[in-house]
């Protein structure tokens, strides 16, 4: 695709999702919840400015009384023939689950954009992991994962195209804070490309299915008895089977346009790798750095990124795993008490059994819960652990577990050399440090023709807490989705911090 068909802008993940989703949304039902709130705010702002979607209309935005109300409004809009979208996270997503089941059964093209966040259990955490996403895996909704801000820009509109053509609800998710609030300079595909990909016949068929007593009367959402309900549910297998094909079709078209690889599962690493990590979310960007570094040192390692989590395609996973692989570590960003393994790990184990690769040793581990930082040394330690004399599933990485002793040893001396410049700013909540750094990194990214990245860490307090601004910029793409540890420049706003 010619370069003039792209535009470049420094944005965070939430902004990229809002821009992408607005194109194919007719009704947006919203309710704020951290860290997804900016998506809804941006869509509301675009609508108030009179911005047109791909259909030439201004999006109708309705703020509801809760996330349950937002999902109900989406359901009603879809039944009435409007393409509807919502944005949420954490407990808000849980409140939507009853309606998600209905959207799936009624084959409605709802789209949820989720900045994945921890669920409140022993304590409340507003920070990111994927517990909320995994709670939806049994609903039957299609689930698409973006691993970076750039991928959000590419896959947010793709999620809508899949929903429309496959007549299925789609949950498009990415890591809360680490990706939703990270700023990167992003390449946006221009609107004409997306309009050309839209299946207009599918849109027309969806409109025809709208509940309308005047000429298109149908019965929907009735009650069935035991003599027929089972058969009807199984008959939907034919519909569900086409979702993977539709997703693959759009993955391929976006890959061809951008040069960025998209598929249900994407492999990165040595073609003859013996050790592979499987994960989804921002940690895969860090893993790319580690795999690249270890390959230079002669190690045969690889990474599999999960883009299509549901439906989970055994066929595509088997085709992605190199024949040489002997050991796999599956990393889950959640903890599911009482289970014999975390969700992605169990999916991979079952897939390997179905695919005839029971020769592969598989270990499952947890990382990054509640936005716990995952550094390159942690990924390196996972590869090392696969070769350890004593291994176990259920390991943790990134913490020192001195209670249940499930954490694995970490090589504290491991580090990756980078050519970019890194900066670390310590500030006081509401003192303007974060806002100034957001402006600075956008100027660098938009005006200096350099790659730029910014991430901001702070506690749950609205003001008065410690803030840390992690800035990086350089001549090469930046995949460092972790805190700056060895900064070239450090700023401190308060003497007391020193």
Language-model region placement:
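Conserved thiamine diphosphate
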Residues: 126-176, 200, 350, 354-368
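Glycine-/acidic-rich phosphate or pyrophosphate-binding loops and their flanking alpha/beta elements
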Residues: 10-16, 251-275, 288, 406-420
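Anionic-ligand anchoring segments at beta-strand to alpha-helix junctions in alpha/beta enzyme folds, i.e.
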Residues: 26-63, 271-272, 276-307, 419-486, ...
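Thiamine diphosphate
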Residues: 1-135, 140, 157, 376, ...
């Amino acid at each position: 695709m010619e370069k003039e068909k792209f535009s470049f802008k420094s944005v965070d993940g939430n902004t990229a999702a809002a821009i992408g989703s607005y194109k194919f949304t007719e009704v947006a039902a919203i309710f704020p919840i951290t860290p997804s709130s900016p998506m809804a705010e941006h869509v509301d702002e675009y609508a108030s400015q009179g911005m047109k979607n791909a259909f030439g209309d201004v999006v109708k935005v309705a703020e509801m009384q809760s996330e349950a109300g937002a999902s109900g409004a989406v359901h009603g809009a879809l039944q009435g023939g409007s393409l509807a979208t919502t944005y949420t996270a954490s407990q808000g997503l849980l409140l939507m689950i009853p309606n998600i089941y209905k959207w799936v059964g009624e084959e409605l093209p709802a789209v949820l954009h989720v900045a994945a966040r921890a669920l409140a259990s022993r304590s409340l955490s507003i920070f990111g992991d994927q517990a909320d996403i995994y709670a939806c895996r049994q609903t039957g909704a299609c689930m698409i994962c973006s691993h970076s801000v750039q991928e959000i820009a590419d896959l947010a509109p793709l999620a809508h195209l899949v929903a429309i053509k496959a007549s299925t609800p789609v949950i498009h998710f990415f890591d809360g804070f680490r990706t939703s609030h990270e700023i990167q300079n992003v390449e946006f595909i221009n609107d004409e490309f997306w309009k050309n990909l839209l299946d207009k016949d599918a849109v027309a068929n969806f409109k025809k299915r709208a509940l309308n007593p005047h000429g298109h009367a149908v019965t929907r959402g009735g009650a069935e008895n035991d003599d027929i309900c089972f058969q009807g549910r199984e008959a939907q297998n034919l519909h569900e089977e086409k979702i993977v094909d539709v997703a693959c079709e759009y993955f391929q078209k976006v890959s061809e346009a951008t040069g960025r690889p998209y598929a249900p599962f994407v492999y990165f690493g040595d073609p003859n790798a013996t050790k592979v990590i499987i994960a989804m979310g921002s940690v895969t960007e860090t893993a790319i750095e580690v795999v690249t570094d270890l390959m230079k040192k002669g190690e045969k390692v690889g990474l599999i990124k999960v883009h299509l989590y549901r439906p989970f395609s055994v066929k595509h996973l088997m085709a992605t795993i190199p024949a040489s692989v002997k050991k796999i570590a599956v990393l889950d960003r959640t903890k599911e008490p009482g289970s014999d393994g975390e969700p992605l790990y169990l999916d991979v184990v079952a897939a390997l059994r179905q695919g005839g690769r029971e020769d592969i040793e598989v270990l499952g581990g947890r990382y990054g819960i509640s936005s716990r930082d995952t550094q390159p040394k942690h990924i390196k330690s996972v590869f090392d652990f696969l070769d350890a004399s004593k291994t176990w599933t259920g390991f943790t990485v990134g913490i020192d577990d001195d209670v249940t002793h499930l954490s694995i040893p970490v090589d504290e001396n491991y580090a990756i050399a980078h050519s970019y410049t890194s900066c670390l700013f310590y500030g006081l909540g509401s003192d303007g440090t974060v806002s100034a750094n957001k402006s600075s990194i956008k100027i660098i990214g938009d005006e200096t023709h350099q790659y730029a990245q910014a991430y901001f860490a702070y506690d749950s307090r609205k003001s008065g807490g410690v803030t840390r601004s992690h800035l990086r910029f350089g001549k090469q793409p930046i995949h460092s989705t972790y805190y700056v540890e060895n900064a070239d420049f450090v700023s401190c706003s308060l003497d007391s911090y020193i």
